[in-house]
């Protein structure tokens, strides 16, 4: 094959490869669809409603270690990004080594207002994506961190066992 014929072929090949990568990343950044609700719960401290939580899975049931899972939190009050990150780090204490928490977490947890929704989607491959009001924020590929993050709400020894039971559809 002459050099003149190879260049157009390589250009077309590169264009197709880039298009495939672009479509894959676009598909992964779309808000998850087709999941069934497992359970829901309201999280309150004293008399303050903080958020409503809903958990979704492929078939509407929760089985530890299985994915995909989608956790949606709809907030009832304003909370700064810094407060969300700090509380997340506090809740991860004992579940995940603080030094190993991905630095991107600071960029992925936005400030929220009353009515805002923050969602975390754990894919079957262990990657986790964050969404804010349905808009893709970014993802973390650390499957150990992603599981520990969901365990804040789903672990048998979570700080709020009633919330955990309801999210798992047990009440």
For the regions a language model picked out, list residue spans one by one:
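Bacterial N-terminal signal peptides that target proteins for export
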Residues: 2-13
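N-terminal signal peptide c-region/cleavage motif recognized by signal peptidases
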Residues: 22-24
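Terminal leader/tail segments of proteins
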Residues: 26-171
């Amino acid at each position: 094959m002459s050099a003149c014929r190879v260049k157009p072929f390589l250009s077309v090949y590169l264009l197709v490869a880039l298009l495939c990568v672009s479509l894959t990343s676009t598909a992964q950044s779309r808000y998850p669809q087709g999941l069934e609700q497992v359970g829901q719960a309201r999280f309150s401290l004293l008399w303050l409603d903080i958020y409503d939580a809903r958990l979704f899975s492929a078939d509407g049931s929760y089985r530890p270690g299985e994915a995909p899972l989608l956790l949606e939190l709809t907030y009832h009050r304003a909370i700064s990004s810094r407060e969300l990150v700090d509380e997340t780090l506090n809740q991860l204490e004992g579940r995940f080594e603080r030094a190993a928490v991905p630095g991107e977490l600071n960029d992925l947890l936005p400030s929220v207002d009353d009515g805002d929704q923050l969602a975390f989607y754990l894919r079957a491959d262990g990657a986790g994506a964050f969404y804010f009001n349905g808009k893709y924020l970014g993802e973390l590929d650390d499957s150990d961190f992603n599981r520990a993050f969901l365990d804040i709400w789903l672990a048998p020894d979570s700080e709020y066992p009633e919330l955990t039971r309801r999210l798992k559809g047990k009440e």
